[in-house]
Amino acid sequence: MKIVNTLILIGAGLAAHAPVQARIAEYQLDNGLKIIVQEDHRAPIVVSQVWYKVGSSYELNGITGVSHVLEHMMFKGTENLEPGEFSRIISANGGRENAFTSRDYTAYFQRLEKSRLPVSFRLEADRMRGLKLNEEEFKKEVQVVMEERRLRTEDNPEALPYEQFSATAYLSSPYRTPVIGWMDDLKNMRLEDLSSWYQQWYAPNNATVVVVGDVQSSDVYELAKEHFGPLKPSVLSQVKPQQEASPKG
């Protein structure tokens, strides 16, 4: 899993060379799910992404890093899939997949041959509301994230000072906490923290599906209705605005 702090181009490599006047279609299902489609017919490939409007800036003290740990756990099984089966299915269909967490969002994506888009939608819809959080898998993934933090931050002579600088420079903004979380919070994280976070934010009315590739927009919309339409929306928490304190002097 890769943490990034800036928006990636929609559709990765496909969108990098897309026509300037590319046609973009937008839809919204009755349950609140937003759908954005950009047609690109130069190759029989499709990139499908699901963006959730939640990231490290939403986290409270004591559970920093929960968004990123949950990102890892999204690959560890649902009511219908065993741990790791999501990735195995994508690979068996000739695809590639990954995910990333940032301050304001968490996103998951797959790149597949265009006829395999239903596979992506079926799997993403399944884990949007049917994730099965397992204590044993959770303990392993927290250790993975802690090691990731050691490697990328604590043992990095450039990253560690920058993290400390950000925590000092931002007095009240939620951007002061690292996306990966503070080590003490990771050590003390509980499965219940992830479960609450998942139930709170992972819902169709807090998600946007983005599809770029050799598709017809209307077909993508119908496919989204089939797979995501039955999912029930959630009552989303109102995020209290947190603005940085005004500088003085």
Locate each region found by the language model.
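Short beta-strands and strand-coil junctions in structured, solvent-facing domains, enriched
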Residues: 55-60, 130, 217-218
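Active-site SXXK
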Residues: 64-78
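Sec-dependent signal peptide recognition
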Residues: 2-9
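M16/insulysin-pitrilysin zinc metalloprotease superfamily fold
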Residues: 77-80, 111-142
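Acidic/histidine-enriched alpha-helical segments
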Residues: 132-150, 216, 236-249
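Hydrophobic h-region of N-terminal signal peptides that target proteins for export
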Residues: 10-19
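Non-catalytic, conformational "gating/processing" segments within enzyme and secreted inhibitor domains
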Residues: 195-226
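Non-catalytic beta-strand/loop surface segments
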Residues: 18-56, 80-116, 152-206, 230-249
